[in-house]
A protein has these predicted regions:
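Central hydrophobic cores of alpha-helical transmembrane segments in multi-pass inner-membrane proteins
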Residues: 11-23, 57-58, 83-89
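Membrane-embedded catalytic scaffold of the fatty acid hydroxylase/desaturase
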Residues: 44-53, 68, 72-224
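Membrane-helix exit/interface motif
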Residues: 55-64, 68
Length: 297
């Protein structure tokens, strides 16, 4: 148990090659060489930092587990509860990673590709665990989930999320689309289109988005990437670009609280209006739509 993602590497490789073949022979342009290599290098680097933090994280969870409220058996209902607890937490980690710039600085890596394919799933942060995102899961050992099983559930979630990074699958039967995260739902999440920004955070289940008001169906075909793309294939720049911009913003920002906002406010925050957050961009889009509709009356 624990990190079982290594066992999935052959599956990752085979399916990536299959999708690449579909892209080449179907002339669908899912892949470009530089983008794919950048994604793969980011994935390898992520494995290194994840392994570096694995023992530390397991140690923290083990200490917390010694104060557990109850013993949750890892059979039957206990396994179901584990997966639901992990998925619920993953939703909020993901949502926070889009709404708090400190965490976005790591997560932005995963959204930095302007393509959407299985290699994009492997484009992972080098700083996510180092930034302390694992603390969101600290409640689970305190409740009574064994640490090794918490790590296992996280691996299961990552493996599930791999296959939804594809354009080769359009939509699935409606009951599946209603309950689970699917390629269609996740394509929306990777879009840079204003109406799609900060939507569909779900990991395995999409029901959390439906419950908490962050769900949107795929309508128009998404344009992938960031609101302002970083336009580089350099792995070091991909990994650390946003951290560098944060440091620059903090350095030049006037006043202590403004400096804090550049770290912890939503991405796009600026004290002088030079940049815009998702909320601001979407508010402008709504006003523009209302104005256009009014002009037609």
């Amino acid at each position: 148990m624990g990190d079982i993602t290594n066992y999935a590497i052959p599956f990752f490789a085979l399916t990536l090659l299959l999708e690449l073949g579909i892209s080449i022979y179907g002339k669908r342009k899912y892949y470009t060489n530089k983008d794919t290599w950048a994604s793969l290098i980011m994935g390898v680097g992520s494995i290194g930092t994840t392994l570096l933090m694995k023992g530390f994280k397991f140690g923290i969870f083990t200490v917390l587990y010694s104060f557990k409220a109850v013993d949750i058996p890892m059979v039957g209902w206990g396994l179901v509860a584990l997966l639901l607890a992990d998925d619920f937490t993953a939703y909020w980690v993901h949502r926070t990673s889009h709404r708090v710039r400190y965490f976005w600085a790591s997560h932005v890596v995963h959204h930095s590709s302007t393509h959407y394919n299985l290699s994009t799933a492997l484009r992972q942060t080098w700083t996510g665990e180092l930034s302390g995102s694992f603390w969101f899961y600290a409640w689970m050992p305190l409740v009574g989930f064994p640490p090794i099983w918490i790590l296992t559930a996280g691996s299961v979630s990552l493996i599930y999320q791999y296959w939804i990074h594809t354009e080769a699958i359009k939509t699935l039967p409606s009951p599946i689309e209603f309950i689970f995260n699917t390629p269609s739902h996740h394509r929306v999440h990777h879009s840079r289109d204003v109406k799609y920004l900060d939507k569909n955070y779900g990991a395995i289940l999409i029901v959390w988005d439906r419950i908490f008001g962050t769900f949107i169906n795929e309508e128009d075909h998404p344009e992938y990437g960031l609101v302002e793309n970083i336009d580089t294939y350099n792995p070091l720049r991909i990994a650390f670009a946003e951290w560098g911009v944060i440091l620059k913003d903090v350095w030049i920002a006037p006043g202590f609280f403004t400096k804090l906002k550049y770290v912890f406010a939503p991405p796009g925050y600026s004290h002088d209006g030079s940049r815009k957050t998702t909320d601001q961009l979407q508010a402008e889009a709504r006003l523009k739509k209302v104005a256009e509709q009014s002009g037609k009356l």
